[in-house]
Amino acid sequence: MRPARALIDLQALRHNYRLAREATGARALAVIKADAYGHGAVRCAEALAAEADGFAVACIEEGLELREAGIRQPILLLEGFFEASELELIVAHDFWCVVHCAWQLEAIERASLARPLNVWLKMDSGMHRVGFFPEDFSAAHERLRASGKVAKIVMMSHFSRADELDCPRTEEQLAAFAAASQGLEGEISLRNSPAVLGWPKVPSDWVRPGILLYGATPFERAHPLADRLRPVMTLESKVISVRDLPAGEPVGYGARYSTERSQRIGVVAMGYADGYPRHAADGTLVFIDGKPGRLVGRVSMDMLTVDLTDHPQAGLGSRVELWGPNVPVGALAAQFGSIPYQLLCNLKRVPRVYSGA
């Protein structure tokens, strides 16, 4: 079997979830959309089922996968429904539903439902993706209450720059939300991962930890709470070939790298088809048999190359950590002008191996 694999530490996942609740004192929806950010939604939900207050996914298809796997906790559909016909399924499977636009509100008013919905009414407090504008929010709230189709309303919004702790935008959004929701009945959900960790004064009855669950910091600098996160995924593979090359020899596509001296080059079974970034630069950190090493040469579809010259004990079968406890995925992503969300979600071909269930 090809040695590339993603090790998933479910005990670390539970630790990170508990940290989110400890930091806020609020109930927490574990965000496991996009197949739990590449970690496997069903297995992550099963690992958290005994303690999670609920889960959040992007769409009904993701919710149905969880229900079919036996997950019975509340599941929030973060984008709501895309067609009015989905309302029947939402009721049948007891999903909670975000309502963020006029046509969704109208569809609920017209629907004949077997029982009332639990709705999360979303305000666009300044991110400008989806949600009712502040001046329209109270009217939408009143229409939902008057419809007779809704059992409970949670009022929510989403911060666009909470990962920038010195940026005033979060306080501006909070002020807009507070003004527009004043006097309206319902619980509040405002805090995403960076707000859970870095904005303790933001009120929330419910929080929505996402990237922090998987042990990746949303911040570019050290933070005392973020530093307590544990990485859930370790991406690793093995050396499958060793080349002894003299100085001046090209390595890989485009001859981007040439040996600087007599070097031992290890070929690792990992490439961009697995989700490792093709544009990783020469010198990118890897760990070889538990010691720091470096990538050299261009990443190809199924393989990449590392410098084994200063690792005399390394050779065929040596373990190479691409990201994980020794190579933080957030720091790695920043080197490529990317974000940890993208790297984690891009893993499609690598099998997962779970521990800590």
UniProtKB/Swiss-Prot annotation:
Instruction: List the active-site residues.
Output: 33 (proton acceptor), 253 (proton acceptor)
Q: Does the keyword Isomerase apply?
A: yes
Catalytic reaction(s) noted:
L-alanine = D-alanine
Post-translational modification N6-carboxylysine, affected residues: 122
Give the matching InterPro entries: Ala_racemase, Ala_racemase/Decarboxylase_C, Ala_racemase_C, Ala_racemase_N, Ala_racemase_pyridoxalP-BS, PLP-binding_barrel
Q: Name one GO biological process term.
A: D-alanine biosynthetic process
Q: Name one GO cellular component term.
A: cytosol
One annotated GO molecular function is: pyridoxal phosphate binding
Binding residues annotated for substrate, in chain numbering: 129, 301
N6-(pyridoxal phosphate)lysine sites (modified residues): 33
The answer on whether this UniProt entry bears the keyword Iron-sulfur reads: no
Reading the lineage from the top rank, the first entry is Bacteria
Cofactor(s) this protein requires: pyridoxal 5'-phosphate
EC numbers on record: 5.1.1.1
Annotated coiled-coil positions are: none
**Entry keyword set:** Isomerase, Pyridoxal phosphate
Q: How does this chain assemble? A: Homodimer.
Q: What is this protein's function? A: Isomerizes L-alanine to D-alanine which is then oxidized to pyruvate by DadA.
Q: Which HAMAP family match?
A: Ala_racemase (MF_01201)
Similarity field = Belongs to the alanine racemase family.
Its recorded name reads: Alanine racemase, catabolic
